[in-house]
């Protein structure tokens, strides 16, 4: 995924927008389902065994997506070079974080789907844990500077509103 931006401020704004969009895409259905359940809406499972299978399958998919997203994010830095230009570094950073947040976003949507068909609080707990893990890695200028090991000149160029080459 290639991001179009002129300067560090615009990059950070677009990066933040994507992060918040991923969170909002799961918060909206979660809120609607929660409100519907408060009014008495309930999907019942045909048997208790189906519930256990649901926990296992959806829980396994969520765990896989969570760990795969984090693993891909961390292993992606093997290709990183400090010799790249600032624009190349920022593009690399966005691409690796894009994949991570996309995977975590899909995992949150699966947790919301699990909450739709289940009456226990297991999937709510999983959903909250996923949101918490996403908020730990939320966008921050210092995080970008630290992870990309930017030089003082690059930090200055990133923070100023002038165009990045």
Segments (PLM) and residue ranges:
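Membrane-helix interface/capping segments
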Residues: 66-89
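Select subsegments of transmembrane alpha-helices in polytopic membrane proteins
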Residues: 17-27, 95-104
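Membrane-interface helix termini and inter-helical loops of multi-pass transporters
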Residues: 37-47
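Alpha-helical transmembrane segments and their membrane-interface junctions
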Residues: 32, 102-123
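Alpha-helical transmembrane segments and their immediate juxtamembrane interface regions
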Residues: 125-162
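Short, Lys/Arg-rich, polar N-terminal cytosolic tail immediately upstream
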Residues: 1-10
